[in-house]
Amino acid sequence: TTDLPTQIQIATDLICKFLRMVPTIQEVYIWKGTDYHEIYGLPAGEYIATKVQEKMKISTKYMGNYSWIELQYKDHSKKLFISHHASGGTVYPESAIARDLQGFLKAWGAERLPIKPDIIVRAHNHSFIGIHEHNIRAIQLPCWQFFVPYDNAMKRYPYWQPDIGGVITLFDHKLRTTAWPFTYPNIIDPQSYLKLTKIYGVTGKRLGKK
């Protein structure tokens, strides 16, 4: 659906369902999504965070456009850069992720970034991709929304079919990382799928009904 209140309700219900399945979760973080999911002055993510916290009584924080997060365990540390927004690569989407990774390395080497990320997490392109280079793991998240037939999406119809699901990232006692994606089968929109049953055939030189 492209109806914003329905999208907010669905996202809230999905997060709450996951929290009930994993009751040990102590905090939830939500980042800003694409602008067409937003209302001016009231980001959808901020509203979702408020609803989740009210419903589940668990600390839920709206993080805005991006965040740097540092994980620490004993003598080990991992730094994550997280943002919904991502550069595109329609035909070869892996190349966009690789360029992003190289851009972080270049900016860090030129001292334009004070931190070298260990993990880069992005979304927006609606498909799961995982790349590991130069001791950096780059993860592009799948989507929770089925195909939306707006003009640009229809032009790139075979390329913009989304992966529906999520990613669970596991860290061991040394903060070594494993990204475990889970996806669900896509579906055909029943309103756009027309099944024609053959009722006519050619008999001799005449078109006759079979």
Q: For each predicted feature, which ranges?
A:
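A short catalytic or substrate-binding loop motif that flags glycine-/basic-rich loops and adjacent residues
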Residues: 60-64, 160-163
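Short, electropositive alpha-helical surface patch
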Residues: 37-55, 136-144, 199-205
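Active-site glycine-rich loop that binds ribose-phosphate moieties when present
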Residues: 51, 55-56, 63-67, 96-109
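A short C-terminal boundary segment appended to hydrolase-like catalytic domains
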Residues: 171-210
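Conserved beta-sheet core of the metallophosphoesterase superfamily
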Residues: 77-81, 86-180
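Core catalytic region of metal-dependent phosphoesterases/phosphodiesterases
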Residues: 1-61
